[in-house]
Regions:
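Exported/periplasmic cell-wall-interacting domains
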Residues: 23, 28-29, 84-87, 96-209
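Bacterial Sec signal peptide processing site at the extreme N-terminus
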Residues: 17-44
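Gly/Thr-rich phosphate-binding beta-strand-loop-beta motif of the actin/hexokinase/Hsp70
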Residues: 62
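Bacterial N-terminal signal peptides that target proteins for export
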Residues: 1-10
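N-terminal post-signal-peptidase region of extra-cytosolic proteins
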Residues: 37-51, 57, 72-80, 93-108, ...
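Hydrophobic helical h-region of N-terminal Sec-dependent signal peptides
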Residues: 9-19
Length: 209
């Protein structure tokens, strides 16, 4: 790997008015409010078959790479200590743009832009992001991140989960901190309706953005 990596420059994030007045957007490296305000810049790969997804569990960062070049970087939420995201080199096993949780509790809850890895029970998908490990093992991504990662990958794309990556102290450190925990739960009727998938395709969810 080259010693000098091409760093992504994140544009300033525009302030987004959400349900709570405390949700604010600041410069990268600081608090950015909720994940619905985050839209990562992306570089198109020159060789899509060389794309890899790298996940840092300690930094809660996801990087889409091609060789030593970072094409996309984003904060994510990974598995908590009792249900960690499986470490190792995996591959995307399946992709489902519109998917719902099938097990209880939470059956019917949308898990949009689903990309399974390790096993059918683990995936990268849209979900509420918090600044600490909080999932049952999946990797939750901001909505706009999830769409871009979904479009950049294919079944068979490597997913490499490690405690840290070479980019955590550079690109990763410049990313904002995202926290969806202040947001209320959307109505159950909305989350289980077809409108949630129609909104997903427009890059929005309920009235969060």
């Amino acid at each position: 790997m080259k010693k000098t990596l091409r760093l992504l420059t994140l544009p300033a994030l525009a302030a987004t008015t959400l349900l709570l007045n405390s949700c604010q957007t600041t410069t990268s490296g600081g608090t950015s409010g909720t994940a619905f305000s985050f839209d990562p810049p992306v570089t198109k790969p020159s060789n899509p078959s060389a794309v890899k997804v790298r996940i840092s569990t300690s930094a809660q960062r996801l990087y889409v790479t091609e060789g030593d070049k970072v094409l996309l970087a984003s904060p994510v939420a990974v598995g908590k200590a009792s249900s960690p995201t499986p470490a190792g080199t995996h591959r995307i096993m399946s992709k489902t743009r519109h998917r719902r949780r099938v097990s209880s509790p939470g059956a019917g809850y949308p898990m949009t832009y689903w990309m399974s890895f390790y096993s059918a029970a683990y995936g990268m998908h849209w979900g509420f992001v918090k600044p600490y490990p909080c999932t049952a093992g999946c990797v939750r991504m901001p909505l706009k991140t999830a769409k871009k990662v979904f479009d950049m990958t294919r079944v068979g794309t490597p997913v490499i989960v490690t405690r840290s990556t070479p980019w955590d102290s550079s690109i990763g450190a410049r990313l904002p901190t995202l926290d969806d925990s202040p947001l209320p739960n959307p109505p159950d009727g909305y989350m289980k309706s077809s409108k949630v998938f129609a909104d997903q395709e427009q890059g929005k969810m309920w009235n969060f953005n």
